[in-house]
Amino acid sequence: MAVQQNRKTRSKRGMRRSHDALSAAALSTDATTGEVHRRHHVSPDGFYRGKQVVEARDE
């Protein structure tokens, strides 16, 4: 099993953690329906780039 030989400093720990932050999802508003959805994803009502691509699910 791997065991470190020397203790990592606070600086090295911080450098490693600098990439762990989460970013907010990029949201768009559909031009035809006004539905808010994630960019480059189909909106919940089945539209993508102004065209109906799939049938909307009934919930």
From Swiss-Prot:
One of its GO terms (biological process) is translation. Residues 21-33 have a biased composition (Low complexity). Residues 1-59 are annotated as: Disordered. InterPro entries: Ribosomal_bL32, Ribosomal_bL32_bact, Ribosomal_zn-bd. Residues 7-16 have a biased composition (Basic residues). GO terms for cellular component: large ribosomal subunit. The keyword Ribosomal protein applies. Pfam families: Ribosomal_L32p. GO terms for molecular function: structural constituent of ribosome. Keywords: Ribonucleoprotein, Ribosomal protein. NCBIfam families: rpmF_bact. HAMAP family: Ribosomal_bL32. Belongs to the bacterial ribosomal protein bL32 family. This is Large ribosomal subunit protein bL32.
